[in-house]
Amino acid sequence: MNRTAGLALLLILLAGCTSSQPTSQVTATPTKAAHTFAGGCAGTVLTDGEPPVWAQGGWNHTKGTAWGVPWALGTQGNTVAYVFATQLVAVQSPRSDGTNNKILWESKDNPSGDGVTVEGRPLGQTNPVVKIAGGPSIVDVPAAGCWTFQLSWTASGQHTSTINLEVLPAGTPPSKPA
C-alpha cells in the first residue's frame, strides 16, 4: 500500500471514531450580580452572593437575588460569618448610630454555631484577645484595624478556620450596603 492510500485509510478510521453530537444551547438564568462590601481584610471578602448550602438553613431567600446579610467565608471553606453590622466599629455596642456589632458565626459541622468558640485579635498580634461564643454574638473589640477571628470546634476531631474583618475607629458610622 502506498503512503497516500495509508494516510487516507487512517483519516477515514479516525473520522469514524469521533461523534458529531449536536451542540446544546445553554440558556442563562438571570441572577443578580454578587457585590463585595467593605469590612473584610487580609484576604477575607464580604459579599451578598449565595453562601454555601450548608450555611443557608433558617434563611428565607429568593433564588437569584442578593443575600440579605453580607457574609464572609472562612479559610477552610467550612465557616461563615454573617455580618449583620455591615462593618464592625471599635469599642462597646451600641455604636454611634444605635446599632450593634452583631455577627452570626457558623461552622459546617455546627451550622447553628453551637460548640464554636471564636478568638479575635489584631492581625499579626497576640494581644489583646477577645473571646466570643459561636452563633449570634455581639463582637466588641477595643481597637480599630484588621482583626483575625479564629473559629474552633470539635466534631470528629479539632477544627479551626480564620475570618479577618476590618474594625472601624470608635465613633465612625459604618457604611450602608447599596
Please state what every model-predicted region is.
Residues 1-6:
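Bacterial N-terminal signal peptides that target proteins for export
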Residues 25-142, 146-178:
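Contiguous segments within soluble domain cores/interaction surfaces
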Residues 13-16:
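C-terminal motif of bacterial Sec signal peptides marking the signal peptidase cleavage site
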